[in-house]
Swiss-Prot record:
GO biological process, one term: tyrosyl-tRNA aminoacylation
Residue ranges annotated for the S4 RNA-binding domain, each copy included: 344-409
Oligomeric and partner information: Homodimer.
Motif interval(s): 'KMSKS' region: 232-236
Name of the molecule in the record: Tyrosine--tRNA ligase
Function (record text): Catalyzes the attachment of tyrosine to tRNA(Tyr) in a two-step reaction: tyrosine is first activated by ATP to form Tyr-AMP and then transferred to the acceptor end of tRNA(Tyr).
Compartment annotation: Cytoplasm
GO CC, alphabetical: cytosol
Pfam family, one: tRNA-synt_1b
Family of the protein in this entry: Belongs to the class-I aminoacyl-tRNA synthetase family. TyrS type 1 subfamily.
Motif 'HIGH' region: where in chain: 41-50
Binding site for ATP: K235
């Protein structure tokens, strides 16, 4: 893709939301430039929503541009209020450092850190934690208008709510703007890439660079990963869909993509895979069985990309086993009897095995005839293991048509 119009490609595939000057951004990306994208270490793994961004970075790098990945060890101590209705939980230093290391390891699977336009990964704690507060206020505080900051959507929404906006969070925009300025000065970065909810923060950095160094820098934002109805992608009843196999197993990951809405398949193939446009169009031009095949291609491409061919093969075999009710090959959930706290109800077992987020949801699943143990449909919310004529230490638990696990209880 080198020397091609990568910006037009990204627009066509559905990545781009907004840009501060598309004509100049296009010229910069065609000739090859340095850009940065930031990730705050609020968890020890990326989730599906992050993967859209990682794919955009991957395309930009393949087109000859240099990615600078900023892990927010410093900004993560404050928390971004964008898209939040309440203050984020403040993480301690040890947790932030651990999360940063996990993210570094995970990103290296998708972005090249070798070669002519290799990616560089930096931690903004390396410069933010060294800042003298008084000196920062004197040199950079004068560059920011409180009026303009309060007009930003992220601040405006919080400011009008009862929970309000903490002074800690109010500083986030200044810190992110300073990141852009620092990277512009030290890494020659002149484009910041971010989600559509980061527009105000990125523009603050563009303005700071112009004020302090009279250089031109640019903002480029991406669409958030959403379903066709506009709701956020990457969440299930039991939580987020993580890229770390210890948080979301390859089997669960594979199943998640098999079960997406038909209307989302083509868009996700365009955004999350490297398949060419014609292949994707051919896969999605017909409905019915054809769209089911397209979902299998999507699930296979993403599972292989994230977890590798071996884990994909296992996920496919487990899916076949579940469909054929061959429990020997199902994913196994092993627990101790003590994990159940003397509550052997099916409702509680659903929660402990993470098939349900709560007993209330378990009861709802049972009353809607979505739960079975081995071949027995569970219809009473009070049903316990002892009520069933089964081996109470080794059985198959089913939720709906797609979620099946083998449960082993060690006494």
């Amino acid at each position: 893709m080198k020397n091609k119009n990568i910006l037009e490609f990204l627009k066509k595939r559905g990545y781009i939301y907004q840009g501060s000057n598309f004509d100049l951004i296009e010229k910069e990306l065609i000739k090859g430039t340095s850009f940065y994208i930031g990730f705050d270490p609020t968890a020890d793994s990326l989730h599906v929503g992050h993967f859209l961004t990682m794919m955009a970075v991957k395309h930009l790098q393949k087109a000859g541009n240099n990615p600078v990945i900023v892990v927010g060890g410093g900004t993560g101590s404050v928390g971004d209020p964008s898209g939040r209705s309440e203050i984020r939980k403040i993480l301690d230093r040890k947790t932030i450092d651990y999360n940063c290391e996990c993210l570094k390891k995970q990103m290296s699977k998708f972005i090249s850190f070798e070669g002519k336009n290799k990616a560089v990964m930096v931690n903004n704690a390396d410069w933010l934690l060294k800042i003298n507060w008084i000196e920062f206020l004197r040199e950079f505080g004068v560059c920011f208008s409180v009026n303009k900051m309060l007009a930003a959507e992220a601040f405006k929404v919080r400011f009008e709510q009862e929970s309000g906006l903490s002074f800690l969070e109010f500083n986030y925009m200044l810190m992110q703007a300073y990141d852009f300025y620092y990277l512009n000065q030290n890494y020659n970065v002149n484009i910041q890439l971010g989600g559509s909810d980061q527009w105000s923060n990125i523009l603050a950095g563009v303005d700071l660079i112009r004020r302090k160094s009279s250089k031109e820098a640019f903002a480029l934002t991406l669409n958030l990963l959403t379903k066709h109805d506009g709701t956020k992608m990457g969440k299930t009843a039991t939580g987020a869909i993580w890229l770390d196999k210890n948080k979301t197993s390859p089997y669960e990951f594979y199943q998640y993509w098999l079960n997406i809405d038909d209307q989302d398949v083509e868009r996700f193939l365009l955004l999350l895979t490297e398949l060419d446009d014609k292949t994707i169009s051919d896969l999605c031009k017909e409905k019915g069985k054809k769209i089911v095949e397209a979902k299998k291609v999507l699930a296979s491409e993403l599972t292989k990309m994230i977890h590798g061919q071996e884990e994909l093969d296992k996920a496919i075999e487990q899916s076949k086993a579940a469909f054929e009710n061959a429990s020997d090959n199902l994913p196994t959930y092993e627990l101790k009897a003590s994990d159940l706290n003397n509550d052997y109800s099916i409702a509680n077992i659903l929660v402990v095995t993470k098939l349900s987020p709560s007993k209330a949801e378990s009861r709802r699943l049972i009353t809607s005839n979505a739960v079975s143990v081995n071949e027995t449909k569970i219809t009473d919310v009070n049903t316990k293991l002892e009520d069933l004529k089964i081996d109470q230490t080794n059985f198959t638990l089913h939720k709906g048509k797609k979620n099946h696990i083998k449960v082993i209880i060690n006494k």
